[in-house]
Amino acid sequence: MARGSVILLAWLLLVATLSATLGLGMPTKEKRGWTLNSAGYLLGPHAIDNHRSFSDKHGLTGKRELPLEVEEGRLGSVAVPLPESNIVRTIMEFLSFLHLKEAGALDSLPGIPLATSSEDLEQS
């Protein structure tokens, strides 16, 4: 029995020694370079102000990062109408046209052709 315990203990010591030398044990986490937080902590706030972040890609900004320009005609400008507003404006103009047509305000205009349907012809 004592001989089996000695062999077991020797085997465990051999396995522990081999796993430590071959790197089979618990892997340690490697540190791979500087992060912005560690650089700011170690170098101070003046290093962060001059740091060019990853969002400063010239010409490769995302939709959320587009700056709103005040100038007209530039991409991202407030004055440029969105396609949704064009659709809404067209629908509003069409509805106002139908309202004027029902009210009879368009009958007196000479430039607009009369659009009569088959139902209108049957009623008259």
From Swiss-Prot:
GO BP annotation list: feeding behavior; negative regulation of cell population proliferation; negative regulation of lymphocyte proliferation; nervous system development; neuropeptide signaling pathway; parental behavior; positive regulation of apoptotic process; positive regulation of cortisol secretion
UniProt keyword annotations, A-Z: Amidation, Cleavage on pair of basic residues, Hormone, Neuropeptide, Phosphoprotein, Secreted, Signal
Primary location group: secreted
A single GO molecular function term of this UniProt record: galanin receptor activity
Superkingdom per UniProt: Eukaryota
Residue list for modification Phosphoserine: 117-118
InterPro entries: Galanin, Galanin_pre, GMAP
Propeptide feature ranges: 20-30
Signal peptide from the UniProt entry: 1-19
Threonine amide carried by residues: 61
One Gene Ontology term, aspect cellular component: secretory granule
Cell compartment(s), UniProt: Secreted
Transmembrane segments: none
Function: Endocrine hormone of the central and peripheral nervous systems that binds and activates the G protein-coupled receptors GALR1, GALR2, and GALR3. This small neuropeptide may regulate diverse physiologic functions including contraction of smooth muscle of the gastrointestinal and genitourinary tract, growth hormone and insulin release and adrenal secretion.
Similarity annotation: Belongs to the galanin family.
Name of the molecule in the record: Galanin peptides
Organism: Rattus norvegicus (Rat)
Name of the encoding gene: Gal
